């Protein structure tokens, strides 16, 4: 069913499939009961498992509940213009067993972004996602757009960004989504994006720093910095600097920085424990693509932590996330070896919807309101590397980032 797919559900049997002749229904209060059409009777317990259940959360965005003349509950999907007696929340039922508390976390590595947003309405909220024309950035943007948010795709390639916008509008023609040019490898482009955004006179509730480059051959940007470092860290740092006044005025607001578990396999300090710029923006002779990526991801966590320390008193929180292991996306396309590696690993990886889940969780979870300075993997907080926890390194990186921008743009840095 299209409506169920939109709600983040599949029209497939669940693990506790009903026997032939049985139907699952819900009361208007959310309790699940089972109708046996063969014997014309109903019961609260599942006919196979014996469990009682109730649906979790509110109805998906765009749905409404009603009661017909016979007292039976029905559901209206205003987006797809259809009515059904099947509760769209039935895929998200929870056991009604208060005597057996569970410590299982609410979401995990198999959760999708749409499942996290199930029942949420983001009408009136503005979300910016960098690198949103494909991969987890696209799924992040789509998930928020399908739940009422005004979503801006900040992308370098406008042709692909326009295609991404069209794909979202195909799923829901009323989605409020647009694309704006942002090239993180060019500081002037970051500046122009910020100016274009501010000209819209809209708030900014969620900023997702998602864009990244991986496995590039060594090159310098027009700003004279190694490309991986500028795209993955410095460009996002500058973007947040330029938009922080809007974020603060829109508080409570959230910044999500997409990092990676690979941040654990490197350091950016020298043997004396001091931040080493040559490790961040190395020469061609000292460059190794994987190491450059790992270092940029360490910068992401350090930046997110320091940003939270600075802006949380003004109502802006920041968290860093790891989206998932070896997900198949365009990030690997720069070298055939990585393409082969990602292809071989594909059967064991997350889907893009699952990869976007941790980002969306940190951007939307009510239980994280006002909380930040943390690192998440599989929708669960975990400790980053000891290097990523260094407040001194984070402060030094912040000061260095400011200086690099000032040296290149001078008084026009904003």
UniProtKB/Swiss-Prot annotation:
In this chain, the stretch annotated as Disordered covers 1-24
Q: Which GO terms describe its molecular function?
A: oxidoreductase activity
Q: Binding positions for NADP(+)?
A: 131-137
Binding positions (substrate) = 260
Q: Which InterPro entries match?
A: NAD(P)-bd_dom_sf, SDR_fam, WW_dom, WW_dom_sf, WWOX_SDR_c-like
How is this chain modified after translation? Phosphorylated upon genotoxic stress. Phosphorylation of Tyr-33 regulates interaction with TP53, TP73 and MAPK8. May also regulate proapoptotic activity. Phosphorylation by TNK2 is associated with polyubiquitination and degradation.
One GO BP on record is: apoptotic process
Catalytic activity, EC? 1.1.1.-
Disulfide bond residue pairs: none
Q: Which UniProt keywords apply?
A: Apoptosis, Cytoplasm, Golgi apparatus, Lysosome, Mitochondrion, NADP, Nucleus, Oxidoreductase, Phosphoprotein, Repeat, Tumor suppressor, Ubl conjugation, Wnt signaling pathway
At which residues is Phosphoserine found? Answer: 14
The signal peptide here is none
Region of interest (Mediates targeting to the mitochondria), residue spans: 209-273
Q: Where is the active site?
A: 293 (proton acceptor)
By its UniProt entry, which SMART domains does this protein fall under?
Answer: WW
User: Which cell locations does it reside in?
Assistant: Cytoplasm; Nucleus; Mitochondrion; Golgi apparatus
Swiss-Prot/TrEMBL domain comment:
The WW 1 domain mediates interaction with TP53, TP73, TFAP2C, LITAF and WBP1.
- Assembly information from the UniProt record: Interacts with TP53, p73/TP73 and MAPK8. Interacts with MAPT/TAU, RUNX2 and HYAL2. Forms a ternary complex with TP53 and MDM2. Interacts with ERBB4, LITAF and WBP1. Interacts with DVL1, DVL2 and DVL3. May interact with FAM189B and SCOTIN. Interacts with TNK2. Interacts with TMEM207. Interacts (via WW domain) with VOPP1.
Role this protein plays? Putative oxidoreductase. Acts as a tumor suppressor and plays a role in apoptosis. May function synergistically with p53/TP53 to control genotoxic stress-induced cell death. Plays a role in TGFB1 signaling and TGFB1-mediated cell death. May also play a role in tumor necrosis factor (TNF)-mediated cell death. Required for normal bone development. Inhibits Wnt signaling, probably by sequestering DVL2 in the cytoplasm.
Q: What is this protein called?
A: WW domain-containing oxidoreductase
Q: Which organism is it from?
A: Pongo abelii (Sumatran orangutan)
Q: What is the lineage of its organism?
A: Eukaryota, Metazoa, Chordata, Craniata, Vertebrata
> Corresponding gene?
WWOX
């Amino acid at each position: 069913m299209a409506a169920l797919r939109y709600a983040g559900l599949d029209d497939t049997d669940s693990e506790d499939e009903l026997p032939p002749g049985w139907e699952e229904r819900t009361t208007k209060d959310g309790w699940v009961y089972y109708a046996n059409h063969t014997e014309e009777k109903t019961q609260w317990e599942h006919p196979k498992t014996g469990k009682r259940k109730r649906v979790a959360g509110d109805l998906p965005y765009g749905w409404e509940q009603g009661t017909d003349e016979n007292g039976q509950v029905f559901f209206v999907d205003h987006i797809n213009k259809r009515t059904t007696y099947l509760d769209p929340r039935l895929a998200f039922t929870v056991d009604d067993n208060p005597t057996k508390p569970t410590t299982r976390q609410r979401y995990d590595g198999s959760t999708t972004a749409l499942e996290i947003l199930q029942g949420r309405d983001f009408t009136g909220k503005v979300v910016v996602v960098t690198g949103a024309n494909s991969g987890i950035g696209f799924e992040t943007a789509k998930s928020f757009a399908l739940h009422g948010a005004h979503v801006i795709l900040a992308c370098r390639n406008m042709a692909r960004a326009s295609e991404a916008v069209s794909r979202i509008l195909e799923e829901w023609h009323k989605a409020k989504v647009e694309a704006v040019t942002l090239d993180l490898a060019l500081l002037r482009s970051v500046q122009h994006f910020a100016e274009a955004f501010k000209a819209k006179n809209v708030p900014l509730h969620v900023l997702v720093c998602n864009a990244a480059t991986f496995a590039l051959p060594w090159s310098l940007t027009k700003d004279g910095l190694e490309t991986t470092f500028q795209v993955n860290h410095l460009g996002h740092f500058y973007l947040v600097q330029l938009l922080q006044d809007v974020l603060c005025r829109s508080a409570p607001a959230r910044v999500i920085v997409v990092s990676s578990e690979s941040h654990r396999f490197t350091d950016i300090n020298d043997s004396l424990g001091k931040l080493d710029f040559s490790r961040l923006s190395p020469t061609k002779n000292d460059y190794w693509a994987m190491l450059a990526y790992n270092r940029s991801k360490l910068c992401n966590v350090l930046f997110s932590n320091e940003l939270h320390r600075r802006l949380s008193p003004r109502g802006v929180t920041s968290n860093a996330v790891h989206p998932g292991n070896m997900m198949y996306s365009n990030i690997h396309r720069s070298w055939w070896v990585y393409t082969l590696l990602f292809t071989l690993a594909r059967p064991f990886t997350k889907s893009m919807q699952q990869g976007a889940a941790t980002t969306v969780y940190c951007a939307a979870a009510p239980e994280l309101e006002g909380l930040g300075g943390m690192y998440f993997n599989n929708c669960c907080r975990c400790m980053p590397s000891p290097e990523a926890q260094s407040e001194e390194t984070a402060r030094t990186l912040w000061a260095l980032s400011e200086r690099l921008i000032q040296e290149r743009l001078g008084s026009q840095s904003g």
